[in-house]
UniProtKB/Swiss-Prot annotation:
SMART domains: ZnF_C2H2
Localization: Nucleus
Keyword Ribonucleoprotein (UniProt): no
PANTHER family to which the protein is assigned, alphabetical: KRUEPPEL-LIKE TRANSCRIPTION FACTOR, ZINC FINGER PROTEIN 367
Ribosomal protein listed as a keyword: no
Protein species of origin: Homo sapiens (Human)
Protein name from the UniProt record: Zinc finger protein 367
PROSITE patterns linked: ZINC_FINGER_C2H2_1 (PS00028), ZINC_FINGER_C2H2_2 (PS50157)
Lineage of the organism: Eukaryota, Metazoa, Chordata, Craniata, Vertebrata
BP terms from Gene Ontology: regulation of transcription by RNA polymerase II
Residue ranges of the region described as Disordered: 104-151, 290-327
Amino acid sequence: MIRGFEAPMAENPPPPPPPVIFCHDSPKRVLVSVIRTTPIKPTCGGGGEPEPPPPLIPTSPGFSDFMVYPWRWGENAHNVTLSPGAAGAAASAALPAAAAAEHSGLRGRGAPPPAASASAAASGGEDEEEASSPDSGHLKDGIRRGRPRADTVRDLINEGEHSSSRIRCNICNRVFPREKSLQAHKRTHTGERPYLCDYPDCGKAFVQSGQLKTHQRLHTGEKPFVCSENGCLSRFTHANRHCPKHPYARLKREEPTDTLSKHQAADNKAAAEWLARYWEMREQRTPTLKGKLVQKADQEQQDPLEYLQSDEEDDEKRGAQRRLQEQRERLHGALALIELANLTGAPLRQ
C-alpha cells in the first residue's frame, strides 16, 4: 500500500509557494503576499486512483501593482481601460476617481481623504467642480497660481523655449507669470534656503518666507484654520488639512483670540523670549494684515504648498521697473538707428 501512495504523490507535486511582490519605487519598501487557496491532498479511493482535485477558488485580485499600491494610482490611472458595456464598469470606474481624489488631496484643495473616493465618484465628481469653480480661489486676475501638475511641467518648459515672456528661468527655460515666482523657482536649482527659523534649537531653513511663517506656527501653537461646518470647533495649523468629522467641508481662516493663540507654553527662558518677540511683532503688524485680508483672499488657502507671502511683492515691483527700463533702452537704440539711417541716406537722395 505504501508504494501505491508514492506514485500519485509523485504525479501531483505540492503547489508552489504564493508569489511575493516587491515594490521598489514606493516611498517605503512594502512586502505584499498574494494568498492563494491550497487544495486538499487527494485521498486514495477504492481502486487506488486519486480523486480529481477540487477547482481552485480564485482569491488573488487580478490587479497590477499600480492598482494594489494607492500611492501609484495617480501615476498610472491613465492605463486603466474602462469598458462601458461591462458589468463591472461602475466598480472599475472608482479607481480613476480614487486617483483623482488622492492627487487633489495631496494638493490640499479641500478634497476628501482617499477612503471616501468611491463615494466622491458616485456623487458626480464634486471635487472637480469645486476646483473649476470661480470661488475656489485657484484663479485670480486670470493667472493660475500655485505649483503646476507634474505632467504639465515638461509642456511649460517647451512653451518657455518659444515664449516672448522675459520672466524666464535661464536654466530650464521655463516661464512664470510673476518675478517672485521665478525667484522661488530658481532656488530649486541652487538648493538655496534663505529663510531660517530663529526659534531656539530649531534651525530649519525654507525656500519661501511663507513656508517659514507656516512652520513657526508649530512653535507658537497657532491654529488659524477652522472647519466651515456649523458648530464644529476643530482647528488646524495648516490650510491643507481635513476635518476628520467633516472631510468634505472646506477650512476657513479665522484668527484666534488672545487666549487661544498665546496658550503655547515655553520650555525655557530663550523660548519664552522668542515667543514674546513674536507676539509683539504680530501685534504691530495686525492692522496691516487685516487690511490686506479685506482686499484679497488669503493666498495660503488658495495653494498651501506654494504660499507666497505678500512681503515679497517688492521684488516683483523692482523686476517690473527693470523690464520697463530695458524697454526704454531698446526704444532709444531703435530711434538712434533710424536717425543714423536717415543721415546716411540723405546724401544719396541729393
